[in-house]
C-alpha cells in the first residue's frame, strides 16, 4: 500500500508567463518513453514481481518507485502552471467576435485546451499516448538494474536538453530538480550493480556535464541532493545496505540513505477557468462544495483537538 502526502517534492515558482510551448516540451518528461510515468511504472512492476530473497534490492526499487509517483505529480502540476493564463477570461457578454480559446489553434498541442481543460495529459511531446510497452521487467535482477540505469541516464540526458529550451522559472525549477534526482537514481542503480560485481571505473554518469552553467542545478547539488535517496516508508528498509559509502562515479560524493520522505512543497491551486467550463460549478454547486469543505475543515480541527487531549 501507499500513503499520500498532499505536497510536491519540490517548489514550483510562479511561471514568468503563460507558455504552451514549454508545457508541450515538458510533456516528454511526463509521458515520453523515458519520462516519469515510465520510471514510476517500471519500478513498480519490478518491485511487485520481485523473486527471491535479496529483499534489499526490492526495498530499493520500492523506494524509487514511490518517489517517481511524486515526480509524475510535480511534472503534471508544472505543465498546468505553464498553461495557466494562456487563454482569455470568459467575457460576461460573450458574442461571436470574442474567442477566449482562440489561443488553442496556435498551441503546439490543441488537446491541452480541447480535451484536458487547459491541463496536462498522459502523452509525450508529440501527443502520443503513454504506452505500457515502455515498461521493462525481465525478472532477472542484474538485467533489470542495468536497464534501470540506462533509463535514468537517458531521462537525465533529455532533461538536460529540456533545460536549454526555456528559461521560464517554473519550467527551469522542475527540470533542474529532475536533473539532480535522475543523477541520484543513476547512482542508486550503479551502486546496486557494484554490489553485484560491476566496476564502472570512469564510464558514468551520463551525460557528463559541467553544471556550473546551470545555477538552479548547482544550487540543488550544493545540498547533496544528487547523493541522497529516501526510503519513502516508515518501516524498516534495506536501502542503506546497498546505497552507502562513496559515489560509484568519480565525483567524490558520499551517499546518504535517508529514512522517510523529503520535505515537501505546496501544490499550486489552479483557479476556475470559466472559458474552459472548468471546474464547471455554478453558484448552487459551489455552495455545496463549500459546505463539504467546511465539514472537512471542522473534522480535521476536531480530530487534532482530540489527539492533543489524549497526549495530555
PLM regions: where:
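Non-heme di-metal
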Residues: 1-312
